[in-house]
């Protein structure tokens, strides 16, 4: 029996990166793109030489995994409902962040009820530069102890940034959060403690109405030990 798994990708905007990754991995076969019949979806499918579908019910029976690159309520999209419909078809789901807490809780309950797997993908910790920063940061933390963390991010990648910090510290508890200040701009400062390490977090709390992918700030993380500072200036390096 072949170990290669058949995969569909839902969404063609950010989904194009999932589709390219699946198509390049010999462990998977990309069966097609699940979308709304847009020109972009059709063009992506044509470029990759796969099919397109507009309904979950139309998917082939051999599909075992779906990558849902469709947002949730925070973006006015129906990604969680789509993920639940896919699990009801017997398909495991990898869904893109961010989701509201209630959306994620509901999906976990549905996955348990339906006997499926559902994973929330924060994406950034797997990027090569970020993964290397996490690896080096863990080594420093184990040997010297991190004395302080500084992080800055756009609100769109807030959850992913916290996931990077959790991976770096190998946990989050015990944790605490001070009430945020009433800042005079969209830059909001937060003071936290994660895993007994103090953290200063700056979040650009705004979205462009016409393009939620436009960000003037993505991610920066710095850690300080008694021997110096290690910084990640961008998730793409250095």
PLM segments and residue spans:
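Short loop/edge segments at beta-strand edges and connector loops
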Residues: 54, 95, 120-122, 179
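A contiguous active-site-proximal alpha/beta segment in oxidoreductase catalytic domains
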Residues: 100-164
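Short, surface-exposed connector motifs at secondary-structure boundaries
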Residues: 23-29, 88-93, 114-117, 144-145
């Amino acid at each position: 029996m072949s170990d290669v798994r058949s995969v569909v990708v839902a969404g063609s905007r950010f989904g194009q990166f999932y589709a390219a990754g699946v198509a390049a991995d010999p462990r998977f076969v990309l069966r097609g793109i699940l979308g709304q019949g847009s020109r972009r979806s059709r063009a992506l499918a044509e470029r990759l030489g796969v099919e397109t579908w507009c309904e979950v019910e139309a998917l082939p029976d051999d599909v075992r995994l779906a990558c849902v690159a469709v947002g949730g309520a925070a973006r006015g999209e129906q990604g969680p409902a789509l993920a639940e419909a896919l699990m009801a078809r017997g398909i495991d789901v990898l869904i893109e962040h961010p989701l509201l807490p209630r959306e994620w809780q509901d999906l976990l309950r549905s996955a348990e009820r339906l006997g499926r797997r559902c994973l929330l993908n924060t994406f950034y910790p797997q990027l090569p530069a970020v993964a290397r920063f996490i690896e080096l940061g863990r080594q420093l933390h184990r040997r010297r102890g991190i004395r302080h963390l500084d992080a800055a991010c756009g609100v769109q990648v807030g959850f992913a940034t916290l996931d990077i910090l959790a991976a770096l510290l190998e946990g989050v508890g015990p944790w605490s959060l001070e009430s945020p200040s009433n800042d005079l701009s969209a830059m909001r400062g937060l003071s936290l403690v994660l895993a007994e390490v103090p953290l200063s977090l700056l979040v650009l709390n705004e979205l462009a109405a016409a393009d939620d992918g436009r960000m003037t700030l993505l991610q920066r993380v710095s850690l300080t030990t008694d021997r110096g500072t290690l910084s990640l200036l961008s998730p793409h390096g250095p």
